[in-house]
């Protein structure tokens, strides 16, 4: 199953059977499924099948690897374990990896850099901790964090920031409605 992407290579990219087997074995070892090489996909657990899928993607030695919701079908325990494995594999191979997820915990824990999008529009790009500490807008602020950030409607008036009737800060800027 891991060999399949290599069997379709053409021209100068084409590999000998020995080269294909060597690459497949190396990648299987990297994703820790080398002892499962003789099994059929139907004989593998969900986590093992996910590792085979990652191995198939890695065996071609891409410059960029796209993983689109790779953990979405795994149970919570396996998600955590596989997430750590993906991070380890990415670091060992040094392949630029685009990891698409709707799970903020996955994004924050696995990424060197994150892109927060809303309806296909980029809201913010940055290192996870920087984005968390300095959200670019209210959407990003509400999207990140467990538990979610507390947001209050406030107003700036007469040189102060108010929540309800309580003055909480001095603010020497024009009067306006704000989120605090």
Task: Kindly label every feature range from the protein language model.
Residues 134-157:
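C-terminal boundary and immediately downstream tail of ABC-type ATPase nucleotide-binding domains
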Residues 1-139:
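ABC ATPase nucleotide-binding domains
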Residues 160-180:
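Glycine/charge-rich catalytic "coupling/switch" loops of P-loop NTPases
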Residues 53-54, 152, 161:
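Residue-level recognition of conserved structural "scaffold" positions that shape functional pockets
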Residues 41, 135, 147, 165-167:
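Short, well-ordered turn and helix-capping elements at secondary-structure junctions
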Residues 90, 153, 169-170:
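Short secondary-structure boundary/capping segments
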Residues 126, 159-160:
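Intrinsic-disorder/low-complexity loop/linker signature
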């Amino acid at each position: 199953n891991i060999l399949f992407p290599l069997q379709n290579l053409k021209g100068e990219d084409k590999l000998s059977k020995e080269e294909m087997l060597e690459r497949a074995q190396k990648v299987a070892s990297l994703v820790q499924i080398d002892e499962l090489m003789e099994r059929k996909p139907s004989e593998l657990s969900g986590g093992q099948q996910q590792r085979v899928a990652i191995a198939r993607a890695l065996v071609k030695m891409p410059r960029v690897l796209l993983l689109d919701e790779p953990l979405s079908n795994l149970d919570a325990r396996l998600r955590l374990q596989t997430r750590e494995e993906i991070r380890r594999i990415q670091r060992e191979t040094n392949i630029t990896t685009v990891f698409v997820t709707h799970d903020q915990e996955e994004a924050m824990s696995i990424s060197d850099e994150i892109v927060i999008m809303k309806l296909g529009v980029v809201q913010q790009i940055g290192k996870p901790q920087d984005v968390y500490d300095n959200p670019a807008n209210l959407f990003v602020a509400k999207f990140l964090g467990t538990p979610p950030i507390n947001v209050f409607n406030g107003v700036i008036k007469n040189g102060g920031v108010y929540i309800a009737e309580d003055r909480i800060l001095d603010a020497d800027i024009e009067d306006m409605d704000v989120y605090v």
